Amino acid sequence: MTLLKDKLFLSEQTWRWYGPDDPVSLWDIKQAGATGIVNALHHIPNGEVWTVEEIMKRKELIESVGLKWSVVESVPVHEHIKTQTGNFRKYIENYKESLRNLGQCGIHIVTYNFMPVLDWTRTDLAYTLPDGSKALRFERAAFIAFDLFLLKRPGAETEYTDEEKTKARIRFEQMDEKEKQLLVRNMIAGLPGSEESFTLEQFQHELDRYRGIDAEKLRTHLIYFLKEITSTADEAGVKLVIHPDDPPCSILGLPRIMSCAEDFQALIDAVPNESNGLCLCTGSLGVSCANDLEGMMRRFGDRINFVHFRSTQRDAEGNFYEANHLEGDVDMYHVMKAFLELQQRRKVSIPMRPDHGHQMVDDLKKKTNPGYSCIGRLRGLAELRGLEMGIAKSIF
């Protein structure tokens, strides 16, 4: 809890850390001014129980430098749960046990997502900006080229317009073999925090698991999952926060069910338990111009227990890249203002983190996790901290 003038609640500033193998150290994070860590036990296979022993080992490591493990991101939802096949009931029981153990260890916010197969999707992990820094980018023509001519997904050609297919073929013909292989790696090799990586054949096999599962059916599976685990979360004092789809549109024929305000509302209506909460990610949701981020912050404020601040710059072709945190299409001032007012109304400091950052300055010479280099996020956190404080000083 953060107080200013004894009454004002400011956000808890957190930072995503990928564990002991992360090139950004806990001491780096402490020097950036963050106080909370967003972390997961990536070494534990999807579906297995997070034991108290493993949780405490990581928690004590974080606390050894004076930081706090504030948020879990994420306890992965096994694909069998999403498809309701195989051992999905056992995996749900394991998930419940992990929630109990996290609550017992004093960790009370757990992020998850219900995106099939892919966590988040970009075609370029090192897009060079005019200032020389590098960002993550989604190029629609390259994405469609991957789908049609590299993956060769059955039925894919029916999902795109003739104009899109023509642009994709032209784009594909411009690629040399090295660029094609890089595109494949970017699409399916798995990003930081992704627990699975695939060959093209394995990847298609994973996509095939979702044949016959449309958005309505996937939503039914999500609601079933939440109805099974929310009572456990309530008892453990754990808030579940679902991360929205990234990007918020259909990918490779896979259904998307957490892309807009209507999706959020449907989930809350179906599972009203207090533990059923939201992670508001301005970067993911902001890719769609139809999403009113300030309005969503106000409408769903009682359910928002974690915030990712990120901005994207989109164009009319369906492309976007990750912009600086205070630039791009997200009106960060008004979103932050709504966030600050939300915290005053609820009288609570809500964890937020700078979501992604440009690879810049010294980090350009280093091997970094895409989107998770140190200096770009340090800049983002400083800008967001200053914006929040400036708004707070001016209106409270």
From Swiss-Prot:
It catalyses: D-mannonate = 2-dehydro-3-deoxy-D-gluconate + H2O. The keyword DNA repair does not apply. InterPro entries: Man_deHydtase (IPR004628), Xyl_isomerase-like_sf (IPR036237). Gene3D superfamilies: Divalent-metal-dependent TIM barrel enzymes. Pathway: Carbohydrate metabolism; pentose and glucuronate interconversion. Coiled coil: none annotated. GO terms for biological process: D-glucuronate catabolic process. It comes from the Bacteria. Keywords: Iron, Lyase, Manganese. Catalyzes the dehydration of D-mannonate. Belongs to the mannonate dehydratase family. PANTHER family: MANNONATE DEHYDRATASE. This is Mannonate dehydratase. It comes from Bacteroides fragilis (strain YCH46).
